[in-house]
Amino acid sequence: VRIYAPTGTHKDLLAYLVRRLLENGANSSFVNRMADAEVPASDLATDPVADMAALEPYRNPTIPLPADIFADRRNSAGIDLSDPLVLEPLQERLAELENKHWVAEPTFKSGSEAEIAPINKPHDLTAEVGTRRDTLDFEVEEAITRAQAIQPGWDRLGGERRAVLLEAAADLFEEHTDDFLSLCQREAGKTLMDAVLELREAVDFLRFYANEARRQFTRPIILPGPTGEENRLSLHGRGVFSCISPWNFPLAIFIGTPAAALAAGNTVVAKPAEQTPLIAALAVRLCHEAGIPEEAFQLLPGAGEVGEMITSDPRIAGVAFTGSTQTAQAINRSLASRDGPIATLIAETGGQNAMIVDSTALPEQVTRDVVASAFQSAGQRCSALRVLYIQDDVYDEMLRMIRGGFEALTIGNPEHLATDVGPVIDPDAKSSLERHIARRKKGGRPVWRRRLHRGANAGCFVAPTIIEMDSILDLKRENFGPILHVVRYR
């Protein structure tokens, strides 16, 4: 006879007991079957491992496999990093790519001399990953000319054919998984898990927009004919789109907006973030290998001046931008001030993401979600948690548990599997975050920081930080890094 007698304080034990009662109350549970007089004791005493081994293989036809969970497109392939048979060969292949040198340059570059900028690891500023060859002013103009010339033909190709090319690109992305994972770690400072998720999101974008091309751009829509006439409505591309992407999702967002524009029949001139052009260069090359014409999807790497020149050109029919609110406003003013047709601006910008926790919340669940949201990817996500409001009744206990979870994080080289939090993207980002933390410290409110590892000074590491404050209104701008602000409310 075994007696199951959990002990603890009311606040810790109650939620635990409720979960256990729900589990044990299920019809299939051991406790429920043991109380059933019609179930023989011999059935209860069987070895569950032996029972499973004796079962015939069976697949429930109503439950789709992971690759088929989306009815209209194939799901991206995952990688089980908990399986040594998967992980160890992957790590060996990534080690072979450690010293590979990558280059990002304009799709159609001239023979003229241009600035060559080194791209270094954000976690080791002495280690060069590759080089970026910046786009010259006249090369920007020529790129837009090429894109404009081919756009009518690309649009006439039709949704079905464009979808086939985007799906071929998605397949090539998965074939080059090792290259993308290596670059995401070395150029963008992402942990291996974050790199896997980034690649999957990019592949999903390509397949999603391929499906949209088929759905919306293959057949015209038949409209009513009030007097017996036939009316057809068909959708077409607007022209040349400029896609300007950020460094925090250097693959997923970089490929997502061009995929949408290409699917709709537009051609694209893409300007990646100056910190992460190598990932973008590989993505564009694979799209060309998949059959997308070079003139239809062009890479224009460089600093912010390249983006300014692109958006000021009156031949640009639309801009898809992801980045800061200030830059989006500048692009909006630039588009409004130029002579030419009114251009579309699709801008995804920043903000302050908040979570409100009341006294009914389960502390363990809150801790797990808060630590993951605030500090995963070193807080460099537009969806990262910035401000946590906790009800006064549970504030001290909840904050104590969150600080415990925050202390358990491993900070360091993102190329190491054990790392939870890697670097921020560059020295400018690090300096900005450190200035914000210093200002909050001067205000006299509590600030908790993790200690950094030895060698952190070689890279752009910011210690995960928790800052207590009075209100979200105390924040004047988004602080894009591993910083969580907490507020007590009644």
Label the model's feature ranges.
Residues 286-292, 312-314, 318, 325-472, ...:
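ALDH superfamily catalytic-core signature
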Residues 185, 215-367, 418, 489:
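Rossmann-like NAD(P) dinucleotide-binding subdomain of oxidoreductase/dehydrogenase enzymes
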Residues 174-180, 402:
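Extended, amphipathic, non-transmembrane alpha-helical segments
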